[in-house]
Design a protein with these regions (language model features):
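DNA-contacting interfaces and partner/effector-binding or oligomerization modules
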Residues: 1-113
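Short alpha-helical
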Residues: 45, 128, 188
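DNA-binding alpha-helical recognition surfaces that contact promoter or target DNA
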Residues: 52, 132, 160, 184, ...
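Output/docking surface of receiver
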Residues: 98-103, 109-137, 183
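The C-terminal output helix
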Residues: 134-148
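Helix-turn-helix DNA-binding segment
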Residues: 144-184
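Basic, Lys/Arg-enriched C-terminal extension of HTH/homeodomain DNA-binding domains
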Residues: 190-205
């Protein structure tokens, strides 16, 4: 059985890196810093760049913090989990996607599907657009207008099956789909994501 990816969330507002969710560290209740987190943890370049570019000297006017989601290929497996957004939302924090170019169609799918996601920052958003989005988010407004291609439900389920290691013949049996139609959906999935299924699978954690 595949191990369920961790939903542990740590704060990046200071060097203490306190755990915020699912179990909040005791010292969090005495902290006066705004709670910001990047999830999943581990992308040091995103963390450093994001803090320096978008979080320093910016005031969050809301009572709850923000989880900025590293929506990139290595973390793809997490985003084919049907419950990932709902699980993070249980933290009480606002959810914002930081999407790379390849996963934009999947990010757009989740923007349409989930009302738990307050915003999205695309890889090609320029500095002005990024700053405008952050201002909207930190003043209680949404910044989740999508642009670009979007996976449909069938393509999402097909991606989920492939990521889970299920073969084409197994997918035919599980989803009762004609194999010719399956290959058509597979080709469309490849065109939207810009990579073959084999390359996609080989680049995830």
């Amino acid at each position: 059985m595949m191990r369920k990816p961790s939903q542990i969330v740590h704060c990046i507002s200071c060097d203490l890196s306190c755990q915020l969710f699912p179990d909040s560290a005791v010292r969090v209740q005495y902290c006066h810093n705004a709670a910001f987190s990047i999830w999943p943890d581990g992308n040091a370049f995103l963390k450093k760049g994001f803090i320096e570019k978008l979080l320093l000297d910016r005031h969050n006017h809301l009572s709850s913090g923000f989880i900025f989601v590293d929506f990139s290929f290595p973390n793809l497996r997490r985003f084919t989990d049907l419950q990932w957004a709902d699980s993070l939302a249980n933290s009480g924090m606002h959810i914002v996607l930081i999407s790379d170019r390849s996963l934009t169609p999947l990010a757009n799918y989740w923007i349409l599907k989930s009302n738990k996601i307050q915003g999205i920052i695309y890889s090609d958003d320029d500095d002005i657009v990024q700053q405008q989005k952050m201002h909207r988010l930190f003043t209680g407004r949404l910044a989740n207008s999508k642009r670009g291609r979007t996976l449909n439900y069938t393509e999402f389920i097909l991606l989920k099956r492939f990521v889970s290691g299920i073969s084409i013949q197994q997918i035919v049996n599980i989803d009762n789909i004609d194999i010719k139609k399956l290959y058509v959906h597979k080709l469309r999935l490849k065109n939207k994501l810009g990579h073959s299924i084999h390359k996609i699978i080989s680049n995830i954690l």
